[in-house]
C-alpha cells in the first residue's frame, strides 16, 4: 500500500507541474521566465526563428508572441541556441572532480555530457562507476553514462578490476545510464567472441545503445561489427573511413579533444549530404585546453570559421547527440524540451553571453552561479583515496640483466616504432629507461624496457595516469631518480612527479583513484604546467607532451611496441619481446 501511495504522490506532483506548463503554454498563466524578442536556432526547420521563449518548471512551454513572465529578459540583438552536448568524453581526463569539470564547461555552453568512466573503473571496478554516478548527481551539467565495455582494455593489462557483463548489468537500471561505451575490442566482435558479444547482447536486452571504437575497420569486419549492434564511432580520422561507416548506418562522432583532433580532416562531413548523422565530441579534454580553448563551443567556433553552415554546426553540437542517445527532451528549442540555452552575440564572433540550465541562469558572461558538490558515500570516498598497493622501491628494482627492447617515439603521435634493443641508459643517444609498476594488488610486477625520442637528459618523470589500467609509469636517465619519483607518486596517493637528483622539481597530486585531483581546475593547471616546464628543463623534447605521451606507452591496443607490467609487448605480432 505504501508503494501505491508513493506512486500516487509522484503522479500528483508531476501532474501539478504539467498543469503549470500547459497553462503557461496556453497563455493563461505567467511563465517563470520569458526570453523576449529572441532570435533562436530552429533545428527542425534549419533556420533562425523569432519570438518570445516562455519557460515553466525548467521546460520550454512555448514560443511565439506576447508571453508574460515573472522574469522577462530582452534578447534583442542576440542569438539563442540549444545547450551543447558532448557525445563522448572521459571526465577523468580533465584531472579534476566532476564538480570542477562542470564549473569549467558551463561558461562554454555545455549542458549535457555523455561520459564513459572506464578510467576510474580500471582502478576501482564497479566502485569507480558508482563513485562517478554519485559525484555527478544533480550537477548543473547533466552527466549521462555509458558503461565501460573493456575493463581491462586487453587481457595483457593488470588493472584494478575485471568487469564482465554480469558485473555491470545492474547499472543499466540507473536513470542516467544510456548504454555500453566504446567497444574497443572490435576484433573480438568481428570474430564472434562470445564473451565480447554477450556484453552487447546484455546492453540490448536493456534497450540501450552501444558505442563504437573501430579506427580503420572496413569490409566484412566492419559489416560484422555493425551487425552486432554497434551504431556509432568516434575514432574516424579520414573522410573515407567515416563515409564507409555512414553508408552502413553508423553515426559519426567528430572528435576534437586534447589527445586526438579530427575536425579538420572530417570537415567535408559537415555538408547537407552527410551531416545528419554526425555529432561532436571531445573524448579527452585536459585542463589547459579547457581553460584556453573551451569545450564543444570551440568545435562549433572552429567549424563555422572553416565555412560550415552555422546551423549545421549547432545541430551537430546539440540536437544530433540528443537524438542518437534518445534524450528526446533536449537539443532543441521547442515546447516540452528542457530550457537549456546558450546565448551568443553572433555566429562570427561566437562569444557566449549567458548559459541557462532548465531555465536557471548558470553563467552571466562573467561568473558561474555557485553550486554544491554532490555528497559521496564515505566508503566510496575513502576507497578512492586508497588505490595504491605498492612496496617501497629501490634503484636496484630497475636494474635488469639482459638487453631490453626500445620503444621508438614518433613526434606528434602516440604510436611507436621498434627501435631495436639496448643494454643500458645512454643519454647521449637519447636511450632512456622506462618501467611500468603494478599498483593495484601489490604483485611486485615491474616491466622494464627502453625508450628513444623522449629527450630527458637528467632525472625522471613518473605518473599514475597510464592508460588504461593506470599503473605507475616512469621514464628516467638513472635508476635512483626513477625509484624516488615512483615512491613520491605513491606518497601522494597518485599524481605526476618530476624528479632530479632526489629532489622534486614539480608535482601534481591526483588523490582520487590516482587519476583526478580534488583541487580547483586553475590550481591543477598551474601545477601541471609547472611540472611540464620542469620536465622540459630536464631535456624532454618541446614537441613532446611529457605526461600525456608517457601515459599512452602502456596501452597495448596501439602499435608497435608497448610496455606492460610484464615487459615490452609487440602489438603487431602479439608477443612479448
Residue ranges of model-derived segments:
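Active-site microenvironment of metallo-dependent hydrolases
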Residues: 1-51, 55-56, 65, 106-108, ...
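Divalent-metal coordination cores built from histidine and acidic residues
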Residues: 2-24, 102-207, 273, 504-509
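Divalent metal-coordination and catalytic microenvironments
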Residues: 38, 58, 77, 88, ...
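Short acidic, glycine/serine/threonine-rich loops at helix termini
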Residues: 65, 124-128, 154-160, 191-195, ...
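Active-site mouth loops of central-metabolism enzymes
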Residues: 86-97, 152-163, 231
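Active-site beta-loop-alpha junctions enriched in small/polar residues
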Residues: 90-94, 118-120, 148-153, 183-186, ...
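Histidine/acidic residue-rich metal-binding segments in metalloenzymes
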Residues: 162-182, 188-253, 260-280, 291-305, ...
Amino acid at each position: 500500500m505504501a508503494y501505491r501511495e508513493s506512486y500516487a504522490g509522484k503522479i500528483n506532483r508531476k501532474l501539478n507541474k504539467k498543469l503549470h506548463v500547459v497553462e503557461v503554454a496556453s497563455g493563461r498563466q505567467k511563465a517563470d521566465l520569458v526570453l523576449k524578442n529572441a532570435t533562436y536556432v530552429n533545428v527542425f526547420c534549419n533556420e533562425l526563428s523569432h519570438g518570445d521563449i516562455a519557460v515553466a518548471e525548467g521546460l520550454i512551454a512555448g514560443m511565439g508572441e506576447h508571453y508574460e513572465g515573472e522574469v522577462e529578459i530582452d534578447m534583442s540583438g542576440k542569438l539563442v541556441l540549444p545547450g551543447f552536448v558532448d557525445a563522448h568524453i572521459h571526465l577523468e581526463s580533465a584531472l579534476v572532480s566532476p564538480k570542477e569539470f562542470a564549473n569549467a564547461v558551463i561558461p562554454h555552453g555545455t549542458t549535457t555530457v555523455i561520459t564513459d568512466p572506464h578510467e576510474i573503473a580500471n582502478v576501482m571496478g564497479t566502485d569507480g562507476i558508482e563513485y562517478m554516478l554519485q559525484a555527478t548527481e544533480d550537477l548543473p551539467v547533466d552527466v549521462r553514462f555509458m558503461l565501460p565495455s573493456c575493463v581491462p582494455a586487453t587481457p595483457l593489462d593488470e588493472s584494478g578490476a575485471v568487469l564482465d557483463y554480469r558485473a555491470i548489468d545492474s547499472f543499466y537500471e540507473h536513470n542516467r545510464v544510456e548504454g555500453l561505451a566504446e567497444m574497443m575490442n572490435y576484433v573480438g566482435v568481428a570474430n564472434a567472441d562470445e564473451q565480447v558479444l554477450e556484453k552487447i547482447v546484455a546492453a540490448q536486452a536493456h534497450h540501450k545503445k552501444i558505442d563504437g571504437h573501430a579506427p580503420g575497420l572496413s569490409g566484412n569486419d566492419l559489416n560484422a561489427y555493425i551487425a552486432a549492434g554497434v551504431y556509432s564511432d568516434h575514432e574516424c580520422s579520414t573522410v573515407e573511413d567515416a563515409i564507409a561507416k555512414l553508408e552502413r548506418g553508423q553515426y559519426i562522432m567528430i572528435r576534437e579533444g586534447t589527445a586526438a583532433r579530427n575536425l579538420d580532416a572530417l570537415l567535408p562531413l559537415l555538408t547537407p549530404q552527410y551531416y545528419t548523422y554526425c555529432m561532436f565530441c571531445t573524448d579527452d579534454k585536459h585542463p589547459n585546453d579547457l581553460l584556453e580553448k573551451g569545450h564543444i563551443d570551440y568545435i562549433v567556433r572552429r567549424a563555422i570559421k572553416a565555412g560550415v553552415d552555422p546551423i549545421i554546426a549547432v545541430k551537430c553540437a546539440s540536437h544530433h547527440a540528443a537524438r542518437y542517445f534518445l534524450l528526446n527532451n533536449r537539443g532543441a528549442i521547442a515546447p516540452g524540451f528542457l530550457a537549456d540555452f546558450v546565448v551568443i552575440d553572433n555566429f562570427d564572433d561566437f562569444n557566449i553571453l549567458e548559459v541557462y540550465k532548465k531555465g536557471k541562469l548558470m553563467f552571466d558572461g562573467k561568473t558561474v552561479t555557485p553550486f554544491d558538490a554532490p555528497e559521496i558515500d564515505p566508503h566510496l570516498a575513502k576507497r578512492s583515496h586508497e588505490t595504491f598497493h605498492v612496496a617501497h622501491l629501490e634503484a636496484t628494482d630497475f636494474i635488469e640483466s639482459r638487453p631490453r627492447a626500445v620503444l621508438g617515439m614518433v613526434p606528434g603521435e602516440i604510436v611507436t616504432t621498434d627501435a631495436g634493443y639496448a643494454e643500458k641508459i645512454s643519454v647521449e643517444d637519447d636511450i632512456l629507461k622506462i618501467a611500468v609498476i603494478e599498483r593495484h594488488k601489490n604483485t611486485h610486477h615491474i616491466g622494464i624496457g627502453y625508450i628513444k625520442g623522449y629527450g630527458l637528459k637528467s632525472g625522471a618523470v613518473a605518473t599514475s595516469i597510464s592508460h588504461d589500467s593506470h599503473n605507475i609509469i616512469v621514464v628516467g636517465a638513472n635508476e635512483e631518480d626513477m625509484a624516488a619519483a615512483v615512491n613520491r607518486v605513491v606518497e601522494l596517493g597518485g599524481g605526476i612527479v618530476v624528479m632530479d637528483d632526489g629532489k622534486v622539481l614539480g608535482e601534481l597530486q591526483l588523490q582520487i583513484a590516482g587519476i583526478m585531483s580534488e583541487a580547483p581546475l586553475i590550481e591543477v593547471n598551474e601545477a601541471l604546467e609547472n611540472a611540464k616546464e620542469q620536465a622540459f628543463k630536464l631535456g624532454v623534447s618541446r614537441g613532446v607532451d611529457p605526461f600525456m605521451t608517457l601515459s599512452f606507452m602502456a596501452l597495448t591496443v596501439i602499435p608497435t611496441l608497448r610496455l606492460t607490467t610484464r615487459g615490452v609487448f609487440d602489438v603487431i605480432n602479439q608477443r612479448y619481446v
